C-alpha cells in the first residue's frame, strides 16, 4: 500500500444485471439516500425491461451465445463511468445493497492508498430477511443488527485498512479502484463468458502487476438472498469453458473446489490439479464417483 492520493470528487457506481429487478430497485433506493447525486451506471445484459427502467445511465449489452457476458458487461459499465468523468469506480453486484458508509469509506480509502483494489466486507442476508429502509446520512444504521460479514474474508474495524490481501479472495461483489488502476489492470478478461473465472483472473493480474488488495473496514454491503446450488451444477458448462481459459492464461486450474465437487457428482470429468483433463461428462457417463 503506497502513499496517499487526491480525494475522489466524482465517484461512480457500476452494476451489471440480468433480471433481479427487485434486488436492483433496493440497491438504487439505498444509493439515492446514502450517496445522493452519485452516478449509477447500470449495464443491462439481454434485458430490455431493465434497459427501459434505468433511464439515461443504462448501457445495453446483447446476449452472448455461450452465456451472460459478465466480464464484458463490467468493462462496458466502467468505460461509461470513466467517459462521464468518474475519478473512483465502485463495482457493486446487483444483489448487494450498500451500507450507509460504503461509498464514504471507499472514497476515504482511495485517498489513503495508491494502486489498490479496495474491497469492503459483504454480509449475506439469510432467506426471508427484509431489506430495511435506507437511513439518511448521519442517521442510525438500518443494517447494524444484520451485519455478519462473510467469514472467509477480512472485516476490519470501521475506518481501518488491511493491505496485503490474498489475491485469490478477490471478488467483484463490492470493490473500488481508480481509473488509473483500472487502466493498468486492463479490466476483466473478456474471454470469460458466463459463470466463473473472471474475478479470479483479475486477482491474479493485480498480483502480477503489484496492485495490492486492501480490505476496507466500514465499507459494508449486504447481499440479498437468492437460491443457489452448491456446487453450481447448472453452470457446469460455463465453469469448464472458463477454467480452460484460466489454465491457458496462468498454467493452473482455478475453482478447484467446484471442479472436485462437480467431478464427484459425475457432472464433469477432471483429472486433478496436474492433469490436462477437464470436460463435461458424456451422456450416460454420469453418476457419483
Spans of features found by a protein language model:
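Short, well-formed alpha-helical segments that are part of the catalytic scaffolds
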Residues: 20-34
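Glycine-rich, basic loop-to-helix element that forms the pyrophosphate-binding segment
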Residues: 64-81
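Short beta-strand-to-loop acidic/aromatic patch adjacent to the donor-nucleotide binding site
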Residues: 86-97
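Conserved donor NDP-sugar-binding/catalytic core segment of glycosyltransferases
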Residues: 101-137
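Short, flexible, basic/aromatic active-site loop/helix in glycosyltransferases
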Residues: 121, 138-168
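A short, conserved alpha-helix in the catalytic core of glycosyltransferases
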Residues: 169-177, 181-186, 192-219
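Active-site donor/metal-binding and catalytic loop motifs
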Residues: 216-232, 246
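Catalytic core of nucleotide-sugar-dependent glycosyltransferases
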Residues: 231-255
Amino acid at each position: 500500500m503506497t502513499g496517499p492520493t487526491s480525494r475522489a470528487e466524482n465517484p461512480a457506481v457500476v452494476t451489471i444485471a440480468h433480471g433481479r429487478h427487485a434486488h436492483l430497485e433496493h440497491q438504487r433506493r439505498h444509493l439515492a439516500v446514502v450517496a445522493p447525486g452519485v452516478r449509477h451506471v447500470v449495464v443491462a445484459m439481454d434485458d430490455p425491461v431493465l434497459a427501459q427502467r434505468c433511464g439515461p445511465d443504462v448501457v445495453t449489452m446483447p446476449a452472448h451465445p455461450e452465456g451472460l457476458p459478465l466480464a464484458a458487461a463490467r468493462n462496458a459499465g466502467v468505460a461509461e463511468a470513466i467517459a462521464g468523468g468518474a475519478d473512483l469506480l465502485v463495482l457493486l453486484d446487483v444483489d448487494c445493497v450498500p451500507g450507509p458508509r460504503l461509498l464514504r469509506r471507499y472514497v476515504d480509502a482511495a485517498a489513503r492508498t495508491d494502486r489498490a483494489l479496495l474491497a469492503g466486507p459483504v454480509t449475506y442476508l439469510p432467506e426471508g430477511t427484509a431489506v430495511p429502509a435506507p437511513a439518511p446520512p448521519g442517521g442510525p444504521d438500518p443494517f447494524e443488527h444484520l451485519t455478519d460479514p462473510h467469514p472467509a474474508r477480512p472485516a476490519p474495524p470501521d475506518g481501518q485498512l488491511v493491505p496485503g490481501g490474498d489475491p485469490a479472495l478477490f471478488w467483484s461483489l463490492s470493490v473500488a479502484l481508480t481509473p488509473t488502476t483500472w487502466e493498468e489492470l486492463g479490466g476483466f478478461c473478456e474471454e470469460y463468458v458466463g459463470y466463473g473465472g473472471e474475478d479470479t483472473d483479475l486477482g491474479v493480474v493485480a498480483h502480477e502487476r503489484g496492485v495490492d488488495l486492501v480490505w476496507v473496514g466500514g465499507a459494508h454491503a449486504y447481499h440479498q438472498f437468492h437460491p443457489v446450488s452448491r456446487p453450481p451444477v447448472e453452470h457446469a458448462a460455463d465453469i469448464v469453458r472458463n477454467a480452460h481459459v484460466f489454465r491457458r492464461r496462468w498454467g493452473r486450474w482455478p475453482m478447484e473446489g467446484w471442479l472436485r465437487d462437480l467431478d464427484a457428482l459425475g457432472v464433469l470429468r477432471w483429472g486433478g490439479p496436474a492433469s490436462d483433463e477437464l470436460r463435461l461428462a458424456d451422456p450416460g457417463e454420469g453418476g457419483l464417483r
